[in-house]
Amino acid sequence: MKFVFALLLLATTAHAATVPTGFTDTVVASGLNNPTAMALAPDGRIFVCQQGGALRVIKNGVLLATPFLTVTVDSSGERGLLGVALDPNFVSNQLIYVYYTATTPAIHNRISRFTASGDVALAGSETIIMELPNLSTATNHNGGAMHFGPDGNLYVAVGENANAANAQSLSTRLGKMLRMTSTGGVPPDNPFINQTTGANQTIWALGLRNPFTFSFQNGTGRMFINDVGQNTWEEINDGIAGSNYGWAICEGFCNPPNPSFRDPIFAYMNDAQTCAITGGAFYNPQAPQFPANFVGNYFFADFCGGWIRRLDPAAGNAVSDFATGISLPVDLQVSADGFLYYLARGAGSVNRIGFAAAGDNVAPTVAITNPANNAIVARKSNVTITATASDNVGVTRVDFFVNGTLQCSDTTAPYSCGWRVPNPMNRTYQIQARAFDAAGNNATATIQVRAN
């Protein structure tokens, strides 16, 4: 069974999913039109792709009226604006990458880079990184997910354009996982570099049907690839350089086993409710808030099933239910401060799941006492960030973030953290202090400062 975006455009009201006891689900923002993918920025903004070509920005819980950018796309079927990734050095270089179905000179998928100027793209900043092969009349199996790996290279999942033969051919980038430099170049250690030429040397793995999403695990660099099956099996594959995942010879586990192909680490059979594995994300944030047994788990979603489940690699890839009642989930992301975000296409919303143990749902109070909001701080200076925090059962720790990156944690009052101000001038930095209590409830204080 398959999903086609164009057939599923009936929006529902944004609402919270059903989550386990102790967890919370909150609507961050709604009003999105056919969203397809998202990326979390270090400063707390969320960039969301809309299939029709607009890249939207959610800032401080508000969907900004002006899109970050709008590209001209073919949005028929599963085509459109399908992927977004932030450069690893986004804080300093402000570079954002997108994957979209371009209309000229022929219909094909394109990877481009833009430069941010605040909450919009700098006019005229588009740089084309890669033009993918021209597409057939089939409008499905485009892939589109993009992430920078721990090696600093850009990984891009590309569908086989509904032509199974593409997946096994090294003469096309369709049906592949690609690996390229940030400028579209070929890393010298790519696995098929001596078997291909030109842009096909970016092929990193093959035998994929429609790899809709994938995720890297923080700390280990392990990659899981979610590959949408045809009629029977939805796959989670271990992303390993040079692998052939078997499509279209195999769907799910090869039967009989075939040593030429890498079987999935987990596959589930479609039923009357499920149709396509979509979002996927490892839970390894800098500051976890979920219970310890969730850390290292891989969360994944099914588009038609409307659920999120979790796979535990440390327990033999055992799978457990987690959240239900989501309207067409398409993407999952984990933030540095330990929230699990999901993108609900049917509801046009971004939600986040947090944890607050049963029995105590009173959040701490927290305030940043230094520096002052909107203060000017000297470049390359050492600033001590201080905060006060209190709670009905006691504060266990305060985490300090600058532009979404954890700087340090303090478990003893008065709570403080040292921060070295970077060199660029006229740069705005968001500082957050997040206080936790023993039940996992948390609250955040936010200020901003400018370096000069």
Question: Where are the predicted features?
Answer:
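Long, low-complexity serine/threonine/glycine- and acidic-rich segments characteristic of extracellular
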Residues: 359-452
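Short beta-strand-to-coil "C-cap" segments at the C-terminal boundary of structured domains/repeats
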Residues: 180-182, 351-358, 450-452
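Sec-dependent, cleavable N-terminal signal peptides
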Residues: 1-17
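Conserved blade-ending motifs and adjacent loop-strand segments that build the rim/top face
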Residues: 317-335
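Surface-exposed loop and turn segments in beta-propeller and other repeat-based domains
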Residues: 67-77, 125-139, 183-204, 247-272
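Short strand-turn-strand beta-turns centered on an Asx-Gly dipeptide
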Residues: 60, 236, 402-404
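Beta-propeller blade signature
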Residues: 111-118, 172-182
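Acidic, Gly/Ser/Thr-rich repeat motifs that build Ca2+-stabilized beta-propeller blades
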Residues: 17-165, 213-229, 273-316, 339-354
